[in-house]
């Protein structure tokens, strides 16, 4: 089956397509895609992943045509608004 792996690195957005075996997990597909060689800053222990915009675990099984998304880490949220709503 075929799946794609996308990583929205601001410096070099990447989308890779790869052929994987039926029943392949998200993590296996990420490994097989080569994205970790292209983007060594990816840390699957710290970054969330999803399939078509929904968070999934690394051991989740895939279906033909799935798009795996590796999300950027949020390093800081700056709350600089002046309202008293929060």
Curated annotation (Swiss-Prot):
SUPFAM superfamilies: MoaD/ThiS
UniProt xrefs under InterPro entries: Mopterin_synth/thiamin_S_b, RnfH, RnfH_sf
Gene3D superfamilies linked to this entry: RnfH-like
Family: Belongs to the UPF0125 (RnfH) family.
Protein name: Protein RnfH
Source species of the chain: Azotobacter vinelandii (strain DJ / ATCC BAA-1303)
Lineage: Bacteria, Pseudomonadati, Pseudomonadota, Gammaproteobacteria, Pseudomonadales
Encoding gene per record: rnfH
